[in-house]
Every structure is written in C-alpha cells, then in structure tokens.
C-alpha cells in the first residue's frame, strides 16, 4: 500500500504526468458498456496474449459485479477511450482493483498514470492509503508497484516499510 499524504513523485512519474496531461478522467459506477468490453477484450488478447476470447459474462463477473462500493475510471483522449481502472472505495483506503488500456498506447505508461491519479484521488477523499494489491517480486508485470514510495508490505499480518525490510522481499508471503 502507498501512503497518499507522503507520496513523492519520481522524475519518470513527473514525465508520465506531463505526457498524459491531455487526458480526461470520468468516474462512473460499475456498469457494462460495449466500448469498455471491447477495450477489455483487446487488452486481454494483445497484452496478456489470452488464447481464448473473453465473454461478456466473464467481464461482468470479474469487473462489473462488486459487493463493495466501486468506481470505474474512464481515461479519454478527447473522445477516444484509452483505458479503464476499477477502484474500491473503503473506509480508510482506496483499493486499485484492475486496470486495462489500449496496448497501442503502451508508450504513454497509462498504468503508471492511473496510479498517480488514484493516489491524488485518495488524497482528495482524505484516504491515507492506496492499496495496490499483491506484489510478486519476480513478476515483470508487477514490478512497477515498487516505484510508488513510501509504501508498505503486509508481512505476517503486519504492515512493514517496503525499503526497510529487504530480507522480507524474497519471502513468498509478501504482498503489497
């Protein structure tokens, strides 16, 4: 998890903000929309190389039906939908649930941009934390999570500072 009130932007994160200053973000309750489903399908096929086409039912079950307060964040370049993020709004934190983007727009670093937006949004809501979900040290697709500091890892049911406990990072029980 990332502490929202003490978060510090890195130089590359500043560049990512600059690169995406033209984007508009809209907040919506979870609901099916065809352009969102098409973007999800494209993302799964091209980014994760999913061999099986996704169905509307898969999309609804995974991302639309939620037992907690959830918002969908739509990221637009003018009228073109580039990305969608899902966040859960909890009493003391926001939880970044999932994020999809147009793989053709990968150079924009939309995933990084979305987390920067979510940190700022959590701060506006006076939520001290943005939860980034599990962190797997050896997963290149999750390595970006360690770039958001200060952060804490959940280890043995206790939150510990990310960089003060490097010996924990090799453990399989570590999540961020």
Range-by-range predicted roles:
Residues 41, 64-70, 112-117, 125-132, ...:
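Noncatalytic linker/hinge segments flanking ATPase motor cores
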Residues 30, 55-60, 104-105, 115-119, ...:
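Short C-terminal domain-edge/linker segments immediately following a structured domain
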Residues 74-154:
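Aromatic (often tryptophan-rich) hydrophobic motifs at membrane interfaces
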Residues 1-22, 124, 128-176:
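Terminal substrate-recognition subdomain of acyl/acetyltransferases
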Residues 2-107:
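A conserved beta-strand-loop-helix scaffold within acyl/acetyltransferase catalytic domains
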């Amino acid at each position: 998890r990332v502490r929202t009130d003490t978060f510090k932007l890195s130089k590359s994160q500043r560049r990512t903000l600059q690169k995406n200053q033209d984007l508009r973000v809209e907040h919506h309750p979870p609901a099916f929309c065809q352009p969102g489903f098409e973007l999800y399908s494209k993302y799964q096929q091209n980014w994760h190389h999913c061999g099986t086409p996704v169905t509307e039912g898969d999309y609804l079950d995974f991302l639309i039906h939620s037992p907690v307060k959830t918002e969908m964040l739509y990221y637009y370049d003018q009228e073109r939908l580039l990305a969608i993020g899902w966040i859960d709004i909890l009493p003391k934190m926001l939880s970044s649930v999932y994020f999809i983007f147009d793989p053709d727009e990968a150079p924009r670093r939309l995933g990084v941009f979305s987390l920067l937006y979510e940190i700022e949004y959590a701060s506006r809501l006076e939520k001290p934390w943005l939860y980034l979900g599990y962190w797997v040290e050896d997963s290149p697709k999750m390595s970006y999570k360690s770039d958001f500091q200060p952060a804490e890892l959940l280890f043995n049911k206790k939150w510990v500072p990310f960089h003060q406990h490097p010996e924990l990072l090799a453990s399989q029980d570590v999540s961020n």
